[in-house]
Amino acid sequence: MPPRPRFDRRAPVRELPNINDRINYPQLRVVDADGEQLGVIDREQALEVARERELDLVLVSEKADPPVCRIMDYGKFKFEQEKKAKEAKKKSHQTEVKEVKMRYKIDQHDYDVRIGQAQRFLKAGDKVKCTVIFRGREIQHTALAEVLLRRMAKDLEEPAEVQQPPKREGRNMIMFLTPRKAPLVKKDKDEEVVNKAVRTIPSPARRINTQD
């Protein structure tokens, strides 16, 4: 029998950018870092100009005649391109509604698991539907389910804000959370204590002038 073909598991070779000595065209149309046209010059001359300015010669249009190169900081250019690609990918993300289901009698471990799931969904930019499922006569414990959902909203207040507070939906109790747009600003506990104390201090009694 012929030997079975072996799969090449090596990572694919990444195509190297056409910069500096990897540019093989003898004549190039060159643009400097400020966008100024340097005209059509020899490859060696273009490389020399780039070296003098401590920058890179980058091929930007291979199909042009002659090919067009630009003198630039390639490391900075690559960083900006990757940054733009990440921002474009982030903007193209379609917001989805992810659901986290639980019973109103949930133990701490399972509750922590649901919190972790919700945090991952919110971090990905998705909304979260928190659902408490009732079975049979459990429907009479909607108050406990509401307490559970409000506890979850409190535990997730940093990455999320409540889009829809707890409410009945059929035989379930639901709540919607959405990723928080602005960072949560928490009041300092000492400040809250002081403010509370100030509110409870009675106003001084008005003096009555008994003199004639």
Curated annotation (Swiss-Prot):
Keywords from the named record: Cytoplasm, Initiation factor, Protein biosynthesis
A GO molecular function held by the record: translation initiation factor activity
SUPFAM superfamilies in alphabetical order: Translation initiation factor IF3, C-terminal domain, Translation initiation factor IF3, N-terminal domain
Coiled coil: none
Cited Pfam families: IF3_C (PF00707), IF3_N (PF05198)
Top-rank taxon: Bacteria
Cellular-component GO terms for this entry: cytosol; membrane
GO biological process: ribosome disassembly
InterPro entries: T_IF-3_C_sf, T_IF-3_N_sf, Translation_initiation_fac3_CS, Translation_initiation_fac_3, Translation_initiation_fac_3_C, Translation_initiation_fac_3_N
Record localization: Cytoplasm
Family under the similarity heading: Belongs to the IF-3 family.
Purpose: IF-3 binds to the 30S ribosomal subunit and shifts the equilibrium between 70S ribosomes and their 50S and 30S subunits in favor of the free subunits, thus enhancing the availability of 30S subunits on which protein synthesis initiation begins.
PANTHER family: TRANSLATION INITIATION FACTOR IF-3, TRANSLATION INITIATION FACTOR IF-3, MITOCHONDRIAL
Subunit structure: Monomer.
Protein's recorded name: Translation initiation factor IF-3
Organism: Synechococcus sp. (strain CC9311)
